[in-house]
């Protein structure tokens, strides 16, 4: 017995010794702050931390930095210098209450306040790196003027516009300040010691294990829009078409959860205009289909005020409610309108108001030839009904009501703006399937107003920060478009706030 006990003791000692050895890595780096993700949150955090004197390494999964922020168009701000010069009255008080009321006060009020209060300062902070703003627009039709659309910028002989201009400017500034970006090196796991986060494990493009030892970690990996398992588990509508989500696999969220982070907002998405898979934001086929004229469900009935397409969350929620499939129907007269006069409703800066859809026929006929059920060209309403699986009587009644509304300039069912009432009268009739699309997920990691990651009970996890699409709390159950540019602003401002607090923490 005595011998057996000594063997067990020896084995226990050996195991303890092995566990105390440093984790093996092919490459090891030491820094003050490591940022996981080189998008809007990550680059803003990296530049801000460097400007405050910290040494910073950014781990970026893709071959280029910027992430989906490269495709943003404008940035939210309240009480900006540009707004004041133009006599635009959008106070911080108004913006804060608008965001909170939209969420029915389910959003994290201290966090929302912190973002709103910093928003104007961040616009001017970016200007010192060459970023400029073309104009101030609205997010949703009739909304407040908060969307500061970014203008063109030239860096090293290459021209950038909109979000890519901001990302290029931050990328250049970060490198000028001596920051290090490890491209094609995703973070995989947080390193925790004595209940503090002290680094990140990652893997580079050669499959080598990389360890970055740091005093603080900032997470901003862009959500989980490319992770089908997470979509199935958390998204309200997991079959949504995700737009521009390459590499967004949720690693940042998962590593934070594994380290004890609370969960918040994992189910929230950034709904986009309905459309079809594999069509770009500049598609003329989609631009025609989403004009707010006549949408029907698979039974042939109107289900919404079509003009709510101008506020994506509304159109996404309405489409989700009926099962995720609808059909846009317009006639030959409306097709001619698209070709000769242009569209009535812009698709952001991608297809602007009045654009003549000269690529519509080419795109439509190409999709029609695939015979995949996405588009139909029909000579009669009976044929339209047959193609979408609706009762012809029901569809004919819907169209008759639509045509009556167009004739009297009054929608007596959903009270749509009369400017968008158009008849469907003379064939051929053009039908396009509409399915839910999203520009990403928006939540997962619970944070406080300092962007410190917290547990489900609200206790901070020392040394860990998060922002952008990985972080929850900015919205309630639906992303809001009324404050134009809010998601880009959240990424940039959260990154700066995280950097400021991380630098204070490590000192």
Go through the PLM ranges and name each one.
Residues 9-20:
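Bacterial N-terminal signal peptides
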Residues 114-208, 228-229, 399, 405-426:
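Conserved redox-cofactor binding core of oxidoreductases
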Residues 189, 394-478, 482:
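A glycine-rich dinucleotide-binding beta-alpha-beta segment and adjacent secondary-structure elements
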Residues 205-282, 482, 488-497:
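Glycine-rich loop(s) and the adjacent beta-strand/alpha-helix scaffold that form part
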